[in-house]
């Protein structure tokens, strides 16, 4: 078995690069990238306790200037970063095939994975999240239920809204559609009720990127819950960043969200990480600290475990749940690797927010 041979002999030092726009020498360093870096360092420290040694070189990348040569890249197993699309593209242009370039934060770099076999796209694409959400809705829909898609009337063209419409039609989801604008909001609740069932469950997608509109639609749906309609909301993850949404409404609507990032603060791993991070840095970790840790820990461990053809092995693995992200890497035809890991979370009527298993 090739894998076991690899496992025995591949425990050499992992040679990793980290390229981030930290702007360390400027008057306003990037806090998010510093947090990411702090998470990476903690992962390297934890891995050393497991007997895995890492040679980590860190570069502060400003703009699209790439501070490393092709030779330096060829001496490395992989590079985490750079972050923006142009810089990732320039790095791929000089990176030898045996050195992987991991895009850590920007889902817009996904297109580069189509044409570079050594590109690894870590953030899950919006399309993958939307497909998972619609698949989840379909799996929970029973006979007698109604599916309703609500959108904003005459809203400006938006790539995310268009993408969701494509995903819904590709999934052959039979649904009623209703669109309105906020000025008509007073009548919206009655119009939505007319499309609903009182006996089954009403499963709703609000297809809009506008916080004001989503907020209005959520309020209308919440009103219908009080009128004894059974309503479940299926939402893209952006709803979690809207500050004006009343969280209580999301719980009343038993909201389901498919997302690429969610931290379960009840988990023992997260609690341990929080204690370590506070002790080391005397501050609280941010989502960037978690992302830095998850990525560095996963890729260094995989390279150390599987040796030479490590990424081919990773692409055959099942889902790996890290602290903030799920990793499920798949190879693209002649291209590189994309992450299809999606976390499903449910807002319970008991005010819990929990991860649910697929």
Q: What does each of the following model-derived ranges do?
A:
Residues 1-358:
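Extracytosolic ligand-binding ectodomains
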């Amino acid at each position: 078995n090739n894998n076991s041979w690899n496992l025995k002999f591949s425990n050499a030092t992992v040679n990793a690069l980290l390229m981030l726009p930290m702007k360390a020498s400027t008057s306003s360093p990037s806090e998010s990238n510093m947090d990411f870096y702090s998470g990476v360092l903690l992962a390297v420290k934890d891995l050393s306790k497991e007997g895995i040694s890492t040679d980590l070189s860190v570069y502060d990348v400003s703009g699209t200037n790439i501070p490393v040569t092709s030779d330096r890249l060829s001496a490395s197993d992989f590079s985490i970063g750079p972050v923006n699309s142009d810089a990732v593209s320039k790095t791929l242009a000089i990176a030898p095939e045996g050195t992987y370039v991991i895009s850590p934060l920007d889902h817009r770099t996904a297109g580069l994975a189509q044409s570079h076999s050594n590109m690894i796209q870590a953030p899950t694409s919006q399309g993958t999240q939307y497909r998972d959400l619609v698949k989840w809705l379909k799996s929970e829909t029973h006979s007698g239920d109604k599916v309703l898609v609500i959108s904003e009337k005459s809203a400006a063209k938006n790539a995310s809204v268009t993408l969701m419409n494509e995903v819904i039609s590709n999934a052959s989801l039979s649904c009623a559609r209703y669109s309105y604008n906020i000025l008509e909001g007073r009548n919206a609740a009655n119009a939505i009720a007319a499309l609903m069932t009182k006996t089954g469950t009403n499963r709703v997608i609000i297809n809009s990127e506008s916080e004001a509109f989503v907020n209005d639609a959520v309020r209308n749906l919440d009103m219908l819950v009080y009128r004894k309609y059974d309503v479940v909301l299926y939402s893209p993850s952006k709803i979690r960043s809207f500050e004006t949404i009343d969280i209580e409404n999301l719980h009343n609507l038993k909201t389901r969200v498919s997302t690429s990032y969610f931290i379960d603060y009840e988990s023992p791993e997260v609690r341990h990480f929080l204690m370590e991070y506070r002790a080391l840095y005397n501050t609280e970790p941010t989502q960037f600290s978690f992302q830095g840790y998850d990525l560095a820990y996963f890729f260094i461990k995989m390279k150390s475990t599987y040796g030479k053809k490590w990424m081919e092995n990773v692409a055959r693995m099942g889902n790996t749940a890290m602290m903030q992200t799920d990793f499920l890497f798949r190879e693209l035809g002649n291209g590189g690797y994309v992450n299809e890991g999606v976390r499903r979370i449910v807002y319970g009527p008991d005010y819990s927010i929990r991860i649910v298993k697929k």
